[in-house]
């Protein structure tokens, strides 16, 4: 990467980092582009070289932060995943991500408040940063390891994400309807049932 490209990447990363700080402290609706560029130390015109508007930088942040969560889960679990059956791989990765969010509740709040299926679908197909994981290829590899095949995998993934996002948000932040640790066995049994509903020949 040349010096010009390096400088561009540094400016983009600075804008992303600054926007995340504002969104998780001041709130998305109360944060302006002027706030972001002033703290990042760049001109407003520079912002528009990288992002269309405030919604665009928010969506790219969700994509980037989600990728980082997934990347860390895969890296930390490593070879432990290889010996597990398909459904247990999904649960192990989910558990690791949930634990990360439990340790970073501002990130949990940001993602849960702003995550939509459209944003997530864009995230898994269009990595923001060069070091973001290619989620779609990893997910396709996981699906290929399901011994019975998976029918409508996009619906299955949507339902798992919605379930995990909504239930863990309440359990982590408000201990409702119970603590996270008490919730986990019920959550993972439901994920197993969801996967079982989608098992079958895909052809």
Region roles according to the model:
Residues 1-10, 199-203:
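N-terminal intrinsically disordered/low-complexity leader segments
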Residues 4, 10-14, 18, 156:
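N-terminal positioning helix adjacent to the helix-turn-helix/winged-helix DNA-binding module
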Residues 14, 22-56, 60:
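Helix-turn-helix
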Residues 51, 58-72, 111, 131:
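Alpha-helical DNA-contacting segments of helix-turn-helix folds
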Residues 60, 74-103, 157-160:
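Hydrophobic alpha-helical connector segments
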Residues 96-122, 169-173:
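Amphipathic alpha-helical segments used for helix-helix packing
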Residues 119-147, 154-158, 185:
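Amphipathic alpha-helical packing segments from all-alpha helical-bundle domains
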Residues 144-190, 201-203:
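Hydrophobic/aromatic-rich alpha-helical bundle segments in the mid-to-C-terminal region
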């Amino acid at each position: 990467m040349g010096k010009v490209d390096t400088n561009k990447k540094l400016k983009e990363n600075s804008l992303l980092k600054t926007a995340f700080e504002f969104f998780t402290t001041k709130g998305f609706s109360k944060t302006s582009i002027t706030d972001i560029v002033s703290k990042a130390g760049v001109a407003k015109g520079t912002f528009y070289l990288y992002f269309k508007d405030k919604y665009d930088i928010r969506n790219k942040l969700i994509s980037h932060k989600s990728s980082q969560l997934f990347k860390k889960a895969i890296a930390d679990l490593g070879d432990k995943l290889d010996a597990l059956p398909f459904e247990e791989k999904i649960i192990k990765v989910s558990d690791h991500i949930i634990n990360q969010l439990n340790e970073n509740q501002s990130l949990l709040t940001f993602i849960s408040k702003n995550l939509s299926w459209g944003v997530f679908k864009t995230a898994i197909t269009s990595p923001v940063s060069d070091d973001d994981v290619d989620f779609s290829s990893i997910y396709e590899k996981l699906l290929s390891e399901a011994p019975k095949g998976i029918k409508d995998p996009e619906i299955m993934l949507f339902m798992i994400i919605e379930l995990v996002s909504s239930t863990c948000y309440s359990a982590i932040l408000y201990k409702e309807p119970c603590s996270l640790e008490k919730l986990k066995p019920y959550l993972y049994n439901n994920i197993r049932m969801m996967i079982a509903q989608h098992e079958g020949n895909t052809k």
